[in-house]
Amino acid sequence: MRRLALCLAVAVAALVAAPAALAAGGPVFAAQGGTGVASHVHPGIHYVTVSDGRGGTLLETLDVAHGAVFEGPALRGSWGIPTLGNGYTAGQGLSRDGRTLVLASPASPYSAPSRFLVGDPGRMRAARKVVLDGTFSFDALSPDASKMYLIQYASARNLSHYIVRVYDLRTNRLMPGKIADRSEDEKTMAGSPMTRTTSAGGRWVYTLYQKPSGEAFVHALDTVGAAAYCIDLPKNRALYNIALSLRDHGRTLALRWRSGRPWLNVAAGTWEISYPRARFPWTWVGAGIGAALALLAGGALLLRRRRSEELEQHSGNELGLA
């Protein structure tokens, strides 16, 4: 076990650099270092991959709560944690129960074939290797880790057009066809992932995308039912500053500015867009009333003081003291 200081320094540096490097979005890629992927079962536990300096990879466990790093198994080859978004989104690839971790080659999706490691974080030496012809990157896992969703790109030179595929981890087979919104006519999707959020049980994965034209849409992926829905959004040039969250027990997808100001809501299931009503500014009204009362009180005190001085002067004149 090593102390966490050095690793945290690297993680902080990665978080500082990430927003600048990823502000415009980009393909899902595999990253080493940083904060890795967080456990859903054990708060404060993160899995991070780092180079061993000899062409291999170390899988480390960060225990943020206790300030420690546990060095895990040494893996042959270079592997990273799947990562996407604008620098604010955590790593991907860990199942909801924490028993399955997906690692990807850092060369993906810029080269073919595409390589992935799938296994228990505690026994990654025994992980199975998935090798696919073509240009793929990781997208999501179903809650029971039976399905791995992948992004298949048109080519390594064209990462803005792609389709979503599903790989059956039980049969070790890439399933035919694509996972797409049946109401859409496009043969491929187009856009760069900006940020995402996942439902409490891990079934639904909502990803905010920006098209090459600048238009935005949310890709709602049902990882259990192997279905997808695309919700077109109003054009917004500042998508890098948008955060996603789920409300009303997962029934509402809220898109908010990182300042906390709401932008719009999407109703899960119907996919209807609505705009939050502006709340009455009671805080500002209260502050204004308070300031007005303070001014009135100050004015009354000043008037009383001046009145008292006038009375004293008048009394002095009456007594001939002036």
Residue ranges with predicted function:
Residues 25-30, 68-83, 125-131, 173-188, ...:
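A short beta-strand motif characteristic of beta-propeller blades
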Residues 28-41, 78-93, 133-143, 183-197, ...:
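Repeated scaffold domains used in trafficking and secretory/extracellular systems
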Residues 43-45, 97-99, 144-146, 201-203, ...:
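Short coil/turn segments that connect the beta-strands within blades of beta-propeller domains
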Residues 48, 103, 150-151, 207, ...:
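Residue position within the beta-strands of beta-propeller blades
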Residues 51-56, 106-111, 153-158, 210-214, ...:
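Short glycine/acidic-enriched loop and turn motifs that connect beta-strands
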Residues 64-67, 120-124, 168-172, 222-226, ...:
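Short loop/turn segments that connect beta-strands within beta-propeller blades
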Residues 282-303:
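Selective detector of the "anchor" transmembrane alpha-helix that sits immediately C-terminal
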Residues 307-322:
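Cytoplasmic C-terminal tails of single-pass
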